[in-house]
Amino acid sequence: MGTHGSLTKAGKVRKQTPRLPAKQKKNYPPRLKNRLKYQVRIEKVASARA
């Protein structure tokens, strides 16, 4: 059974890629997140049709 390329080259690109610092994420509470999704999906579509 063959492989998809040489195992000696495994991880080559990942090792060469410079490490970037992690970005801060906005962690909304679930209620607020659901409300924002509702506004984007339903309220804006309904107002666009009217």
UniProtKB/Swiss-Prot annotation:
Spans traversing the lipid bilayer: none
Key words of the record: Ribonucleoprotein, Ribosomal protein
Gene Ontology CC entries for this record: ribonucleoprotein complex; ribosome
GO molecular function annotation: structural constituent of ribosome
Keyword Ribonucleoprotein carried by entry: yes
Region (Disordered): 1-28
Source species, domain of life: Archaea
Family note: Belongs to the eukaryotic ribosomal protein eS30 family.
Species this protein is from: Aeropyrum pernix (strain ATCC 700893 / DSM 11879 / JCM 9820 / NBRC 100138 / K1)
Name recorded for this polypeptide: Small ribosomal subunit protein eS30
Annotated GO biological process: translation
Stretches assigned to coiled coil: none
Pfam families on file: Ribosomal_S30
Basic residues bias spans: 11-28
